[in-house]
Amino acid sequence: VGQVSAGKSSLVNALIGEMAAEVSALPSTDQATVHQCTVDGIDLVHLLIDLPGLDGDKAIQKKIVSQITNSDLVLWVLKANQSARKLDVELRQAVDEFYQLAANQNRKAPKILVLVNQVDRLPPLDEWQPPYDLSNPQTQKGKVIAQAVEFNKEKLNPDIILPLCVSQDVPQFNVDTLQQAIVSAYEDGVNTQLNRRRVEGDRLDLTEEAKRLYHLGEVLFKAYRKQL
């Protein structure tokens, strides 16, 4: 999820190119693109859903809130050199309000992983030599990236926040860290999905479903480890 031109599609391409052996876009509605991935012969349906960009349309915002609250993990993409965060803040408030409703207080919210994308475009533009140690930045670029991360952390209060560059034109930054964060969040995502099914009265045997989901997690983890 994210504003128009935040780089969501580029992020999806980077992730599915690294973590999946086969990828195909499934038919979908409301401008969302659903990606079906296969890892080690196991079909992972709806592993990634690329939502329409935030553009101030309240109807779009409502649909995105519905998708977020029915997701296991949310990747929220921000354009690093764009300081306007009104649309993102409004969406975050709408998501929080959903879980504050009495009818939804037993629901487990998915973890939100905010990605400050396109950090290579932050000043100074003539410097780009990743990786950058943001805990103790030694260059002006590193300091600006650290400031951008802190600014967006205060705006959106995510569970996890990472600076990122997935461009094909310059050296990438933090893609491996993002993959590790997704793998680490998998168990929480499984619990979020099982909670959602339980609250909604899903008749599926949740014990068996939990076993299936954890097995898929093992497959993803092995696929990730192969890249190290």
Label each PLM-derived region with a short phrase.
Residues 39-43, 63-156:
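Conserved C-terminal guanine-recognition region of P-loop GTPase G domains, centered on the G4
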Residues 25-27, 51-53, 81, 164-168:
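A short hydrophobic beta-strand->loop->alpha-helix junction that borders the nucleotide-binding pocket
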Residues 47, 51, 59, 131-133:
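Conserved ASCE/P-loop NTPase catalytic core
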Residues 58-61, 88-89, 172-176:
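Conserved strand-to-helix beginnings and helix N-cap segments that scaffold or border functional pockets
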Residues 107, 113, 119-228:
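C-terminal end of P-loop GTPase domains and the immediately downstream helical coupling element
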Residues 1-49, 55:
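Conserved G1/Walker A P-loop phosphate-binding module
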Residues 28, 54-60, 142-145:
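A conditional alpha-helix N-cap/helix-loop micro-motif detector
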